[in-house]
A protein has these predicted regions:
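Sec/Tat-exported extracytoplasmic proteins
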Residues: 6, 85-88, 197, 201, ...
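Alpha-helix capping and helix-loop boundary segments enriched in small/acidic/polar residues
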Residues: 177-188, 209-220, 240-243
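Contiguous, non-catalytic segments that form substrate-binding/exosite surfaces or channel walls
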Residues: 2-176, 184
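Short, glycine/acidic-rich hinge or "gate" loops at secondary-structure transitions
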Residues: 12-14, 96-100, 209-211, 235-250
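An active-site-proximal "capping" alpha-helix that borders the catalytic cofactor pocket
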Residues: 215-232
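Long, well-structured alpha-helical subdomains associated
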Residues: 227-332
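Active-site recognition of the HExxH zinc-binding catalytic motif
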Residues: 190-207, 222, 227
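Extended, compositionally biased alpha-helical segments that mediate assembly or anchoring
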Residues: 46, 55-57, 76-78, 99-101, ...
Length: 367
C-alpha cells in the first residue's frame, strides 16, 4: 500500500507533461462495504480493534494527450484556491488539502483522451467531465500528498449538429424562454473546474463513517462549492457577471434528469437533492407543465446554505445524520417527473459505449 501511496504522491505533482497516464482507483461501484456501518455489532468490533473499513477500489485506466492551451485556462483558478479555502464554512474545524496558509498541493491538466479502459470505460450513463484524484480515502493524503485534476476535453464539447439540435430541443421543452439567452454549454467547463477543486476543500477525514451516503454527500459538496463561490470569484475578476449568470442557468438546466436514480447512483442522487433543495428555497421553480425558471440572484446564496449543512453532516461523522440528510432531500417531485417524461421523448438513451479510433489505430501498429 505504501508504494501505491508514494506513486500517487508523485503523480499528483506532475504539471508539465505531454501525456497523461492514470490508473484510477475509485469505489463508487462498491455498494457492499459501506453497509458495514449499519451493522452495529460488527462496526463495534472493528472500532474496538482499530480496523478502518475502506470501500473496494475498481480499477480503471486513462491515456491522453495534454492540451497546453486548455491547461493554461484551467490553471487560472489556482491563484484563487486559497481564497476559496478561506471562505469555506467552518474552515477552522478541519484540515483541507488546499489551505490559505500552505503551498497549493494541486496540479491540473486538460486532456484529449486516447483510451479509457476498465472502470473508466465501462458501459454506463457517461464519462465524467473530469476527475480529481486521489480520493479522500487514499493513503497518499496522509503522507503529504496532493491531488491532480484531469479534465476530459471530448466529453465537454458538443460539436456535432445532432448534439446541438438535441440541446436546443431540450431548452425548448424544459426551460422558460427568457432564460434561453443564459444557457451556454461551454459554461459547464468553469463549473466543473469549481466542482473538481471543491473536492480538495472541506473536511478530508472522518467521512467514511457516513457509509453508503458518503459519496452522495461528497459529490453534493463539490457542486455546492462551485456554485457558492461564484460571487466571490466574479468579484475577484475570474468571471464576468455575464459568465456568472450563464454558469448558474446552465447548471440548473443540466440538473434536470430523465429518470429517477437509484440510491446507489451518487452523482444523480445528489442532483435530485439539489433540485428539491432549490425548489424549497425558491431558487428555482418548475411549472406544472414542466418548465424551469431560475432565480439567478438567489442561487448562490442558497448554494452556500446547502454547503454549510453538508459540511456540518461531514464533520458530525454520524451515519444516521447522513442518512437523514440524504433522505430528507432525495425527493422526486411530480414536477421533476414531468420534465423527465419530456426529456425521454427527446432521447431515451441512458447508457453508452466509447469509440477510440486513434487508440485502435495505434494498437494495430499502422504507424
Amino acid at each position: 500500500p505504501m508504494l501505491d501511496a508514494q506513486a500517487d504522491k508523485k503523480w499528483a505533482t506532475l504539471q508539465d507533461t505531454p501525456l497523461e497516464f492514470t490508473i484510477t482507483r475509485e469505489n463508487y461501484s462498491d455498494e457492499m462495504t459501506e453497509t458495514v456501518i449499519e451493522n452495529k455489532k460488527l462496526n463495534k468490533l472493528l472500532k474496538d480493534n482499530n480496523i478502518e473499513v475502506i470501500s473496494k477500489d475498481y480499477l480503471g485506466a486513462r491515456v491522453g494527450i495534454v492540451n497546453k492551451e486548455g491547461t493554461n485556462y484551467i490553471l487560472k483558478v489556482k491563484d484563487y484556491l486559497p481564497l476559496m479555502a478561506e471562505n469555506m464554512p467552518y474552515k477552522d474545524k478541519y484540515t483541507q488539502v488546499i489551505s490559505s496558509k500552505d503551498d497549493i498541493s494541486q496540479t491540473m491538466v486538460d486532456v484529449d483522451l486516447i483510451e479509457v479502459a476498465g472502470d473508466v470505460g465501462a458501459f454506463r450513463a457517461g464519462i465524467t467531465l473530469a476527475e480529481n484524484l486521489p480520493n479522500n480515502d487514499k493513503l497518499s493524503l496522509t503522507i503529504g500528498g496532493g491531488r491532480r485534476n484531469v479534465y476530459h476535453r471530448q466529453i465537454r464539447f458538443a460539436t456535432s449538429e445532432d448534439a446541438k439540435k438535441k440541446i436546443q430541443e431540450r431548452l425548448d421543452n424544459i426551460l422558460v424562454k427568457k432564460f434561453h439567452k443564459y444557457y451556454d454549454d461551454t459554461m459547464d467547463h468553469p463549473f466543473t473546474i469549481g466542482h473538481e477543486n471543491g473536492h480538495s476543500l472541506g473536511p478530508k477525514e472522518g467521512c467514511e463513517a457516513l457509509g453508503k451516503y458518503k459519496s452522495i454527500i461528497e459529490e453534493n459538496k463539490a457542486d455546492m462549492v462551485s456554485l457558492s463561490m461564484l460571487d466571490l470569484l466574479t468579484k475577484e475578476g475570474l468571471y464576468t457577471k455575464e459568465e456568472r449568470d450563464k454558469i448558474i442557468v446552465t447548471f440548473a438546466t443540466d440538473n434536470m434528469l430523465k429518470t429517477k436514480p437509484k440510491l446507489s447512483q451518487a452523482h444523480r442522487v445528489r442532483t435530485v437533492m439539489q433540485n428539491y433543495y432549490f425548489l424549497l428555497h425558491k431558487a428555482i421553480k418548475i411549472s406544472k407543465d414542466g418548465f424551469l425558471s431560475v432565480n439567478i440572484d438567489k442561487m448562490v446564496e442558497v448554494a452556500y446554505k446547502m454547503l454549510t449543512e453538508i459540511i456540518e453532516v461531514q464533520l458530525s461523522g454520524d451515519f444516521k445524520r447522513g442518512e437523514k440528510y440524504v433522505k430528507d432531500y432525495f425527493v422526486w417531485t411530480p414536477e421533476m417527473k414531468t420534465i423527465a417524461k419530456k426529456l425521454k421523448k427527446i432521447s431515451k438513451r441512458l447508457n453508452g459505449t466509447t469509440e477510440q479510433k486513434l487508440a485502435d489505430y495505434l494498437f494495430e501498429e499502422k504507424i
